[in-house]
Regions:
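Feature for long, exposed domains in two main contexts
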Residues: 343-449
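Divalent cation-coordinating acidic motifs and surrounding scaffolds
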Residues: 22-346, 381-386, 392, 442-444
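Sec-dependent N-terminal signal peptides
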Residues: 4-13
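Sterically constrained small-residue positions within well-ordered secondary structures
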Residues: 13, 104, 134, 149, ...
Length: 449
């Protein structure tokens, strides 16, 4: 005698809220706007921002998500002005400024501008002191960001700094004071934190004590994402990473000239941001924007090849690229540092519905579909989703899978026992192993009666 079994599936799927495509572009830029009479962007900055938004050295173009500014007058003045400019030159965004002013004894302070469509600013913290035995010229700001559509496991930190300038043992020692304060704070966050150390760090060589402090062992150990450590100042070997000065002739009061000969501006990262998983640096994307190593050392960046620059900015003509190069010599006295970062994976899992009734002893299969739903525009914009699935009770299945961002999703067949009449149930579980995965677990129940 054959009995008919009614089959019911109950499942829980941890999904995600839709958000804008959001692999992240982070830029730090000393803009020399500390003068209260000249706190806003200079003529030509719009061309620089448009060029950065369109540049694709890492393989894709992306509007700036986080902009760290050095030598800002204040968040209320410089911050408001730059957020307004970015909202003008970039569509589909909503740029906001940070809210806390770091202490400063001169030459402004670091601030942050961020695209609230792609990241949230979770916290701001001042690091160090401008007075006392361990004083520094300007406090560092620590910003805690979270990608939109993710939870706290995807948070990352950006330290925004402007270290003591100039050569000499006393200045080097002062830079080390700043580096020690930052490392103490970063180490206290704990092992596994994803950190970017950004800003005008004013190092002339990687042998400086301050650079060694940042890159020393410990929770917050910094690494150069492009592995270009050495004696940068005045060296033709390192002209591709030089950031100051793009100008040889001053066009505004206080502009430092002298041509391109120093790597003062950096994005250094902790090991967790270069291990290939979760929030992570995208290899090949880091550069001093506008520097194609086609200029001469100690000459203006505008002596470089517009043709070579246009090749890194899809859709740009050599004329447009030359406008960018010229603007870089006029808007400030540093080049911006630009790098792209991937987002963590985002898992979705579903169980397909079964027929309401099946024949006892027949072969019944269910399907489990797992996908990487990271909200990106290109596959390189998010980590690969790696996972394992298991089943228990009346359901038989186990295995592993991977899905790239923008992948086609994976379907796994589950076998359900129908040999016994009466209530039969089983569970299906999926656990992601990719770091920081959003919605990393799934559990579904299959019942028969």
């Amino acid at each position: 005698v054959r009995r008919i079994l009614a089959v019911v599936i109950v499942f829980a799927s941890l999904g995600w809220s839709a958000s804008a495509t959001a692999q992240l572009r982070i830029v730090n830029y000393n803009v020399n706007n500390s003068d209260p009479a000249a706190f806003g962007p200079r003529t030509g900055m719009d061309a620089v921002f448009r060029g950065m938004n369109a540049s694709a050295k890492g393989g894709f173009a992306r509007a700036i998500d986080v902009l760290i500014l050095g030598e800002a007058e204040s968040v209320a003045t410089t911050g408001t002005a730059y957020a307004a400019l970015l909202n003008t030159v970039t569509t589909g965004t909503s740029y906001l400024r940070s809210t806390v002013d770091a202490g400063s004894t001169g030459s402004g302070r670091p601030i942050a501008i961020f695209n609230s469509s792609s990241v949230s600013l979770i916290a701001e913290k001042k690091i160090g002191s401008t007075s006392g035995a361990a004083s520094q010229p300007r406090q560092t700001m620590r910003y805690q960001f979270r990608p939109i559509g993710y939870d706290a496991t995807a948070d990352f930190y950006v330290y925004a700094s402007h270290y003591k300038a100039s050569t000499g043992a006393a200045n080097e020692a002062e830079r080390n004071v700043e580096a020690r304060a930052i490392r103490a704070d970063a180490d206290a966050i704990g092992q596994g934190a994803r950190i970017i150390y950004s800003g005008d760090l004013n190092f002339y060589t990687s042998s400086e004590s301050g650079f060694q402090t940042l890159t020393g062992t410990g929770n917050g150990q910094a690494f150069d994402p492009i592995s270009r450590v050495g004696s940068w100042s005045g060296s033709t070997t390192y002209k591709d990473v030089h950031t100051q000065s793009p100008a040889t002739t001053a066009v505004f009061n206080g502009q430092v000239t002298g041509g391109m000969d120093d790597r003062f501006d950096f994005q250094l990262i902790t090991g967790e941001v270069r291990d290939g998983g979760g929030f992570d640096y995208i290899a090949g994307s880091y550069w001093a924007f506008g520097n194609t190593a086609t200029h001469a050392v100690n000459q203006a960046i505008s002596t470089g090849s517009a043709t070579t620059l246009a090749a890194r900015i899809p859709g740009y003509t050599t004329t447009q690229a030359q406008t960018v190069l010229t603007s870089l010599t006029q808007v400030t006295d540093h080049l911006p540092v630009l790098a792209d970062y991937q987002l963590p994976a985002k898992m979705t899992a579903t169980l397909a519905a079964l027929p309401a009734r099946v024949i006892r002893g027949g072969t019944v299969s269910a399907t489990l579909t797992v996908a990487n739903a990271a909200p990106v525009a290109v596959a390189a914009g998010a980590d690969q989703l790696d996972y394992a699935y298991t089943a228990a009770g009346a359901v038989t299945a186990s295995g592993t899978g991977s899905d790239a961002a923008l992948g086609a999703s994976n379907t796994h067949v589950l076998t359900i026992s129908t040999t016994v009449v009466g209530l039969r149930s089983g569970t299906v579980s999926v656990i992601a192993s990719s770091p920081q995965t959003m919605s990393p677990t799934f559990s579904g129940t299959i019942s028969t009666s």
